[in-house]
Amino acid sequence: MNRKTSESLYQEAQHVIVGGVNSPSRAYKGVGGGTPVFMERGEGAYFYDVDGNRYIDYLAAYGPIITGHAHPVITKAIQDQAAKGVLFGTPTRLENEFAQELTNAIPSLEKVRFVNSGTEAVMTTIRVARAYTGKEKIIKFAGCYHGHSDLVLVAAGSGPSTLGTPDSAGVTAATASEVITVPFNDIEAFKEALAHWGSETAAVLVEPIVGNFGIVEPEPGFLEAVNDLAHSAGALVIYDEVITAFRFMYGGAQDYLNVKPDMTALGKIIGGGLPIGAYGGRMDIMEQVAPLGPAYQAGTMAGNPASMSAGIACLEVLRTEGVYEKLDELGARLEEGLYLAAAKANVPISINRLKGALTVYFTDEPVIDYEGAKRSNGDQFSVFFKAMLNEGIHLAPSKYEAWFLTIAHTKNDIDETIEAAYRSFKTVAAGFYS
């Protein structure tokens, strides 16, 4: 497949953009390097690169593009609002409308506030939780990504009773000392952490369904136990639903799982492809936020009319009858086909799937936590990723990321993907990896 224009643009980008990309995951470091594909346009389940190559898209911009690229309802909403103005710095009717829709869809959101990204949303929920509880420490779960604010770029210590260590240059040891990281789905480790730090813990930060070391569901009773134990210690429970909200049903993963947090962070899908974040929760907690309370948060672009219009339109599309049933049906077809293709090529894999999101791990063991995901074979995934790319199938360039289906995918797309996967699994089986 010819990608000479992408190669030229990547060379050019490295002279003016740090690393040639505006987010590290785009640099293909997770698959052993290479030239990122520069895209020209998207249409439905496909996008087209600058050399004219077509790809079936399972990246979906790391999750937001659940409706497919350039959905006509969302495109029209953005175009109509652009003609009226995209930024005023004042309240608008659209903010009220969108906030009402979110609170209707996710009942735990008694009040909401809009921001510009998932990172901002998570960062602010932590600040508000600290203001509400008067405590400082945070407990989070290993392998779960919560954006790039300092407090959540912290790696686990040597055990649940030890404090974290910085996971990025520029994160101070003092900041890391405020975070305790425990394994997901390990309630005993969580109990141990609370035994040591519960009296100092402001909040527990949870992905109710993990999306950042693959799609990993909670073990039965795990989230309920986290809620009960956290509340007994006087800590709040924050759900990071930046990936999961509106991915598995019209609402949050919390509604799918029937577990209610105190606060929730949102992003990705709710923006319809434009930058957005939101956070919300119980009224008494949210009233800690300025101008009502002492916890400060502001933003020039927060609640901008362009993002509000796109978000309202996106949720309108997702309210259509049968949307999530279609995603589940296509996801099941893809999962079954991938298992058969891998078995035929004699390549062991394990797939975690929920509705229209799945992760293919190159391992023969089930993956229920970050350690299991880490043990999956990254070399094999790298070969598979590059083979699939040459077949015209675009995945996320990391063994930890999910495949995201959109409502624009068809059964023919799935079947084409399975055929390409079989050829790619054969490349893996041939041993073209170290």
From Swiss-Prot:
Enzyme nomenclature, EC number: 5.4.3.8
Record text on subunit structure and interactions: Homodimer.
Gene3D superfamilies assigned: Aspartate Aminotransferase, domain 1, Type I PLP-dependent aspartate aminotransferase-like (Major domain)
Encoding gene (name): hemL1
Cited PROSITE patterns: AA_TRANSFER_CLASS_3
This protein's UniProt keywords: Cytoplasm, Isomerase, Porphyrin biosynthesis, Pyridoxal phosphate
Protein name according to UniProt: Glutamate-1-semialdehyde 2,1-aminomutase 1
Stored Pfam families: Aminotran_3
Residues the record lists as N6-(pyridoxal phosphate)lysine modifications: K268
HAMAP family the record matches: HemL_aminotrans_3
Chief place of localization: cytoplasm
PANTHER family: GLUTAMATE-1-SEMIALDEHYDE 2,1-AMINOMUTASE, GLUTAMATE-1-SEMIALDEHYDE 2,1-AMINOMUTASE 2
Catalysed reaction equations from the record: (S)-4-amino-5-oxopentanoate = 5-aminolevulinate
InterPro entries: 4pyrrol_synth_GluAld_NH2Trfase, Aminotrans_3, Aminotrans_3_PPA_site, PyrdxlP-dep_Trfase, PyrdxlP-dep_Trfase_major, PyrdxlP-dep_Trfase_small
TM ranges: none
The family this protein is said to belong to: Belongs to the class-III pyridoxal-phosphate-dependent aminotransferase family. HemL subfamily.
GO molecular function: glutamate-1-semialdehyde 2,1-aminomutase activity; pyridoxal phosphate binding; transaminase activity
